[in-house]
Amino acid sequence: IYFLSTPFISLSQKPNILWITVEDISPTLSMYGDSTAITPNLDKLASESLIFTESFTTVGVCSPSRSSLITGMYPVSIGTHQMRTGKDVFSWGSREYDGISNAIDVNGDSIPLHSVVTPPSVKCFTEYLRASGYYCTNNSKTDYQFAAPVTAWDENGNDAHWSNREVNQPFFSVFNFDVTHESKMWLHRDKPLTVDPKKVPLPPYFPDTET
């Protein structure tokens, strides 16, 4: 779904752009022809938006995909296609524990992880937006497989917001919601389901097992 926060602009104006991202979500939504989930707010947003029905990911895992989004490059062309690289790529800092600071190989040996060093010519597209006058904010996930340069964002963090820009300055603002992230799957396991699992259509590559 593509939605501009300024629907009617002249050719001489720079539109404000609000970019909302969610994670680990499939196109099982009504705007794509699926009626499993009831999502009236998303339906309303979709009715006012341009919907892409023929778009495909460059790689089927989060961080390499995110590196592609922020640079406009194929991950294999800039070395960000391996999942996962170093601890320094995380927006929440470099915490020291095996899940992030080291990888464990098949022999049980600890292998220090690394941050990809992209070619000098590769830039985050927000660097171009900032150069053209945009106020760019990210709230708040980066995780690009490489450390985001300081020139990528005017603000990057949990408090980042377009409201801090100069008067009449156009903005590009990202808000990342992780409520659909796979890691949140079990947070509500004791609550009633909102969808009957028996009514969820299975794609042909998912076997319909007894469990």
Predicted regions and their residues:
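Short alpha-helical segments and helix-capping/turn motifs at coil-helix boundaries
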Residues: 122-123, 154-163
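Active-site-proximal cap/lid insertion segments
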Residues: 27-37, 60, 83, 91, ...
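Short aromatic-enriched loop/helix-cap "lid" or pocket-rim segments at secondary-structure transitions
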Residues: 57, 66-67, 149-151, 184-188
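Hydrophobic alpha-helical packing residues
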Residues: 45, 126-129
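Loop/turn elements at helix/coil->beta-strand transitions in domains of secreted/extracellular proteins
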Residues: 13-18, 48-53, 130-136, 168-172
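Bacterial Sec-dependent N-terminal signal peptides
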Residues: 1-15
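Short, well-structured beta-strand/strand-turn elements
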Residues: 132-146
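Active-site segment of extracytoplasmic enzymes that catalyze sulfate/phosphate-ester chemistry
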Residues: 19, 26-120, 134
